[in-house]
Amino acid sequence: MQEQYNPSEIEALVQKHWHDNKTFEVTEDANKEKFYCLSMFPYPSGRLHMGHVRNYTIGDVVARFQRLQGKNVLQPIGWDSFGLPAENAAINNKTAPAPWTYQNIEYMKNQLKLLGFGYDWSREIATCTPEYYRWEQWFFTKLYEKGLVYKKTASVNWCPNDETVLANEQVQDGCCWRCDTPVEQKEIPQWFIKITAYAEELLNDIDTLDGWPEQVKTMQRNWIGRSEGVEMTFGVAGSDKSFDIYTTRPDTLMGVTYVAIAAGHPLAELAAQSNPELAQFIEECKNSTTSEADLATMEKRGVATGLYAIHPISGKQVPIWAANFVLMNYGTGAVMSVPGHDQRDYEFAKKYNLPIEAVIKPVDGELDISEAAYTEKGVLFNSGEFDGLDFDGAFNAIADKLVAEGKGKRQVNYRLRDWGVSRQRYWGAPIPMVTLADGTVIPTPEDQLPVILPEDVVMDGIQSPIKADKEWAKTQVNGQDALRETDTFDTFMESSWYYARYCSPQADQMLDPTKANYWLPVDQYIGGIEHACMHLLYFRFFHKLLRDAGLVNSNEPAKQLLTQGMVLADAFYYTNDKGARVWVSPLDVVTTEKDDKGRVTKAIDKDGNELVYTGMCKMSKSKNNGIDPQVMVEKYGADTVRLFMMFASPPELTLEWQESGVEGAHRFIKRLWKLASDYVAQDNSEALDVSKLTSEQKALRREVHKTIAKVTDDIGRRQMFNTAVAAVMELMNHLQKAPQTTGQDRAIIGEALTAVVRLLYPIIPHVSFTLWNELGNTNSIEDSQWPVVDESALVEDSKLIVVQVNGKVRAKITVAADADQASVEALGMADEQVIKYLDGVTVRKVIYVPGKLLSIVAN
């Protein structure tokens, strides 16, 4: 074999072998245990970044490991290729989104191949192709027929100048990104899928996700947000009107001093007809984007409507206020306000001089609401017939009374809202609904699917081409004129079922149930924790929809989930003449000085600018601290990049990019290459004969098999790839120091190397493939089996025992592995060093920890 490790040469040869032999293409095989390994597919932005490389390296390590376990492994890849960035790029580059997207796919596909990922490319999908989205459209029509799809008005960001809807990302400081016009909120009809119909099942089934991180499960539980409470009816004084309020704290009902309703509530709009101040407030609320996230931090404002609500139990009248912290699309659009026991209500009451009444007091201690509300549960007082009850007692008594009087009901509510899937954008899958001439809205007939998105378009940056082109919407259904829906699907739709399409990507149906049920559920899913509450919830929801449509048998889409951490890099900037920060790539920093703790104290870039170092932060375009994987692959080779990615940090934690660490990984591979090269150059004809081994040879062989056991557990069960690599590195140190003078010396090195290249194969497959062949194996490493631990090699002939006298180590003795306590005591007491410390004292106690420690207590 060649003496020098040449990554570009061997990686090209090995990748050609995989391509020519279709090594990673798989079909269903009832005789083999399957393993479906999937990393979240990328958006084709143009170039891979290190976050991609980390995600896909982890996936490839798991897939290759499982392959060597003898399993039938599916590892597919594709492209999440619809979305707003393509529209923006098309506008900037004066092209259409389609060619930009397809060009990026080709470029990134080659980058993935350069990194040596073992994908089944025959299953590649791109979600922007009609072959893919036709089945999404078909499924949507089936959901509509089942009553799981409906249309209602919902608020969107509206630019009055361009007369177009803006995505949240296109609103900058409350203004349109393009023309700087203040953005308004506008109610327009949109399509929704009833995810709330599955809220209880989605919540309960979280308990079955044993292989998912607790953090993700907690985030989903909170997002679904199940609560038990009471919905009650308040009358409106002086009218026959009434409205409903839901609360999880009916124990505080007797402390209500006002009611807050959303600006868009029918009662607010009614009162505004004779209240100009309220009308103005409602307009202001309409034009402010209020998400749930904003509610906690924004200033709480309100206007009295002049209306009064009638308390459902006491009959007392309390004022109704319109408030900006109540959302019409959340709950009933009205909340009962108990300032004595809710901090937000307390602050609002203080601001507007509204009464504050206490009705709950601590079980022990004094009640004090002079500075803040008392929000804990306690005992009721000032509550009439309910005085003295605790939370549970009051909940039941008040709920029972409201139910008995027909003024309320017990209710389970969910924080989860139905999924709004309409987007007023162009680059997405058209929603397959049509409006007939008489106004009836129906699904696009199956024989007219797919509704194809035209790709040869001109982007003007203002309106979606399919909205601007009035002819596109015109169609016919059963001989009647009709208009197509011009909204497109939320791109979370495509990523909610792609994993299932991989099972039968060429099928002339949404899924081939036989193939889908062979591969599903996914055995290992890998992606970022930032997807916990959106993609990963829709992913689970869609799987249940597919199940209920008879397309899959399982309840959940993925058995195990690994959420990899972010990749961080150093960030540097200087301030230019205009006072703006100019971020400099770490690759352009030529000089750095560090203090004795390794902190950067001075940095200069290639143009001589003195830089400010801001520390390690997430690789991003904005801070110009992204490292191009391709540059690193060209410099060090794909295996080095992969090895660094796996060794530098546990997979769930952040990874700090350090080129010195990459260089270290490269040196390790060169050491492995040299050890193999030196071994191959010798006469290795003598077979291993365990009966002939010396104690030193047995000890080395023991290290080999201990390493096999540790790496198998680290990769297979613990998924701690960094400690697996560390274990192999430690073994390599032993192997490099070991003699290769006798035939048995070399036989052990040979056994060790054939194990090491398989242990490292998932991580550095090109090197492992090549060395496997150079070591004389006739089969391909992909067809080999994972190394098996020889349990007999782990058995030790002798043990090293530490001997302590009065808690201090005085000697180390070697005893037979099966020596009993009496023998060990005798040897320990006879040791010269121990005798010295026992002279003239009486042994009071001897403690023996088998195989490890002999402790003597004497005085």
Curated annotation (Swiss-Prot):
Organism of derivation: Shewanella sp. (strain MR-7)
Record PROSITE patterns: AA_TRNA_LIGASE_I
Pfam families attached to this UniProt entry: Anticodon_1 (PF08264), tRNA-synt_1 (PF00133), tRNA-synt_1_2 (PF13603), tRNA-synt_1g (PF09334)
EC code: 6.1.1.4
Keywords: Aminoacyl-tRNA synthetase, ATP-binding, Cytoplasm, Ligase, Nucleotide-binding, Protein biosynthesis
Residues holding ATP: K621
Example of a GO MF term: ATP binding
Protein name: Leucine--tRNA ligase
Keyword Transport: no
This protein's record includes keyword Transport: no
This protein's GO CC annotations: cytosol
Domain of life: Bacteria
GO terms classed as biological process: leucyl-tRNA aminoacylation
Family in the record: Belongs to the class-I aminoacyl-tRNA synthetase family.
Motif ('KMSKS' region): 618-622
Localisation: Cytoplasm
Motif interval(s): 'HIGH' region: 42-52
Catalytic activity reported: tRNA(Leu) + L-leucine + ATP = L-leucyl-tRNA(Leu) + AMP + diphosphate
